[in-house]
Amino acid sequence: MATPSLQLGSGNWAVKSDSLLGYKTIDSKYYPREMTFTRATTGTRVNAAGLVEIVPYNLFSYSEDFTNAAWFTTDVITVNTTTAPNGTLTADTLTIPSTTNAQYYLIRNSFFINVGQYTQSFYVKKNTYGYIALVSTINGSLQTSYFDINTGVVGTTTSGTTSSITDVGNGWYRVSQTANETTGANRVIGIYFANSLMNSINVSLSLTDSFYAWGAQLVEGTQPLTYLPTTDRLDIPRIDYSTGSSALLLETQRTNLALRSEDFNNGSWTKSGATVTSDSIVSPSGIQNADTITQSGGTLNINQTITISSVGNYTYTVYLKKGNFDSSTLFRFGAFQGGDLGYITFDFNTNTTSVISGTIISHSSTSLGNGWYRIQYTINIPAIGAVLFYNGGVGGSIGVGNFFYSWGAQLEVGPYPTSYIPTTSASVTRNADTCTKTGISSLIGQTEGTLYFQAKGLVDDSTYSLISLSDIGGANRISIGYANTATNLYFEYRVNSSYLINFNIGYIVKTDNNRIAVKYKLGEQAVFLNGVKIYSNTLSSAFTTALDRFSFDYNGGGFPYYGKVKALEIYTTSLTDAECIALTTL
């Protein structure tokens, strides 16, 4: 079989700060083909370890560009002066600017830190000076960790913080500091010159004193994690493992309207017959930031009142883990607006949800492992105004003294749940994902070709969801994907602005892991689904302008593809029927 001219996925994913790398293989070697990816916000994914994580998990932007305005410094910074730990000439020199006794630093100023534990880290190397400190004002007081980078030794550390230093070779060390934030506020975080006694960040040094720095990182949790370089942090593709294998996650724009999504002890949540112990257990993120909710008496209820600005379908989700109560105890989740709009129950014994009252549109539970479940229901909100969304035991009780664990509440407009969006004091929006590649006429067959993709849709609904090969204006185009009916594929073959083929075909469950291929050449077009040829035609019209772009939509004209894409392949030849059947067989 021919080799694809452009591939994505098939277990081989490479992500850059603002793009996704496709590839071509020649003699078992991979040659990158850079895709254009945009979202303009961060997002979350399920990583290879099965944990929910922020993408990117490095909370520092411009992690290797210390002259960027995101950083505030009193040092003299000379860029790209020495080889960094990754072998590139990208490490900077930080030099004392004055002999005056003072503090000299590279920091993030007024950097918002939510409640929880955080670890900052830098790669550092002695140039002419070898004493530095990591400093933060996490939790409202000065947290200082001193390091001797002449010999690789941790000095004194503020009580309540932990520090480490790791030799990474060639004189470089990775230094880290972990501190606990209990209130959530704007903080100072960064790296300072320290005195040689390692007991002060007020120093009087020579104008020639300097050290090298590279690779700043701030992450949630108590471990520094593998270094992840960043620029603006906004357009990083998400390779998701929620289905057990890797896939590119493409989602529509959604907003989490639930405030303090991980902090049920906050006043945004009203507690009845309940006490909350914050950050008491490891959450689905792998960080100790989930809460324990204990029934203290009366009726157990945790709720938040949210003002709804438009009527329609809303989806509520929350992560839940059983505590010490009898496993037969059911949990109740619902919405109230002048009366019960509807509620569901969740049974830990069977990992199932059930509708008890109201017009619940859909409901389900998903196991994340380690006893955690994500519970979801979709309900129609018939009027604007305040709606109370609640969690609690059926009958109002799980038993006084009994407890459960909770994390990650989310309310979003839409008929199905999307990936988790953390919030603090305000709602947060995750923008839609887009992925395109232009200027690739040489990679697309102009007189014949094949387009293949393997993907799993996010919802089985009546909405077009397409991928396309096209020219710049879309007058010549091949589109394939989900039709605007719940069970059909859509195939379009357009030449010189005329729709020569424009059909809903076949039968498909959009949320299944489907393999789809379309092949084309003069006198033959065909579509294959999961190992079966489901459509053929014999048109002989040639494209009037070159197809020069690929997009996960209708050539930029709407109908974006949202789902979990496991593979994409573009060929400059029309594969045989047997090859297409083999390619699409599950």
What are these regions (language model features)?
Residues 1-5, 203, 218-246, 412-443, ...:
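Extended recognition patches within non-cytosolic domains
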Residues 56-63, 70-75, 100-102, 112-116, ...:
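Extracellular glycan-recognition modules
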Residues 66-67, 124, 208-224, 264, ...:
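Extracellular, beta-strand-rich glycan-interacting domains
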Residues 81-103, 280-301:
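Short carbohydrate-recognition loop motifs
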Residues 103-109, 143-147, 155-168, 300-306, ...:
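Short, aromatic/His-centered strand-loop micro-motif at the edge of beta-sheets
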Residues 126, 178-183, 322-324, 378-383, ...:
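Localized edge beta-strand/strand-to-loop motifs within extracellular or lumenal beta-rich domains
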Residues 173-177, 185-190, 373-377, 453, ...:
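Carbohydrate-binding surfaces in secreted/extracellular proteins
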Residues 188-211, 386-403, 537-564:
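Flexible glycan-contacting loops in extracellular carbohydrate-active proteins
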